[in-house]
Regions:
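Generic recognition of flexible, low-complexity loop/linker segments
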Residues: 10-14, 69-71, 128-129
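Active-site donor-binding loop signature of nucleotide-sugar glycosyltransferases
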Residues: 28, 86, 130
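Pro/Thr/Ser/Gly-rich low-complexity, intrinsically disordered linker/stalk tracts
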Residues: 37-93, 134, 147-157
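Recognizes extended acidic, P/S/T-rich segments that occur
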Residues: 93-135, 147-155
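Substrate-binding cleft of secreted/luminal carbohydrate-active enzymes
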Residues: 1-58
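Short, solvent-exposed coil/turn elements at secondary-structure transition points
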Residues: 29, 70-73, 106
Length: 157
C-alpha cells in the first residue's frame, strides 16, 4: 500500500481522541497479509483488549437491572465459580447477557477493557479458568447488557 503505519496510527488516535463512533479499515487484504506489519501493530497497540458493542441510545437507552447476589467460590484445580441472580430489562423481549470482569483491585474497574474476561454469557453462572494459574484474579464483577449495548451497574465480589 501507498501508506505508512504512522498514518494509520494517527488516524486511529484522531478518531479516539475526538470520541468518534467507530472506525473502519480498507482494504482487509492489507490486514490479512500483514502489509507493513499493520496487523501486528493493531493487535499489539490498538486492539489488545476485548471491545463491547457500543450503546445505541436512539433505539433504547435504559440499561438492564444489575445482576444481584454474586457468589464466588474456588472449585477444583484452582478454577473459580461465579453465580448470580438474573438481571431484567425494560424490554420483555430482551434477555440480558452478562459480561464478566476480573481484577486484583477491588472494586473491579468495569471501564477498563483489560478487565473483561468473558462476554455474551447467557447463563447466570460462569467458570473462571485463568490461562496462567499464577496470574489468577482475586476480585470479580458481573454486569448485564441488553441487545442495544446498554450496560448495567456491576455486582461486585
Amino acid at each position: 500500500g501507498k501508506w505508512t503505519r504512522d498514518e494509520i496510527d494517527r488516524q486511529i488516535n484522531f478518531i479516539r481522541n475526538h470520541k468518534m463512533a467507530g472506525e473502519g479499515h480498507y482494504r482487509v487484504k492489507y490486514l490479512m497479509e500483514n502489509t507493513q506489519g499493520i496487523y501486528d501493530e493493531l493487535i499489539e497497540n490498538f486492539y489488545a483488549y476485548p471491545a463491547l458493542q457500543p450503546p445505541m441510545p436512539w433505539l433504547d437507552n435504559v440499561p438492564p437491572t444489575a445482576p444481584s447476589e454474586l457468589k464466588v467460590r474456588t472449585i477444583d484445580s484452582g478454577y473459580t465459580e461465579l453465580k448470580w441472580q438474573a438481571a431484567t430489562d425494560n424490554d420483555p423481549r430482551n434477555n440480558p447477557m452478562y459480561i464478566i470482569y476480573a481484577s486484583n483491585e477491588y472494586p473491579v474497574d468495569t471501564s477498563r477493557p483489560e478487565n473483561i474476561v468473558a462476554q455474551n454469557i447467557r447463563e447466570t453462572s460462569y467458570i473462571y479458568a485463568p490461562i496462567l494459574p499464577w496470574n489468577a484474579k482475586k476480585h470479580f464483577a458481573v454486569t448485564a447488557v441488553d441487545r442495544y449495548g446498554n450496560e448495567s451497574t456491576a455486582a461486585q465480589k
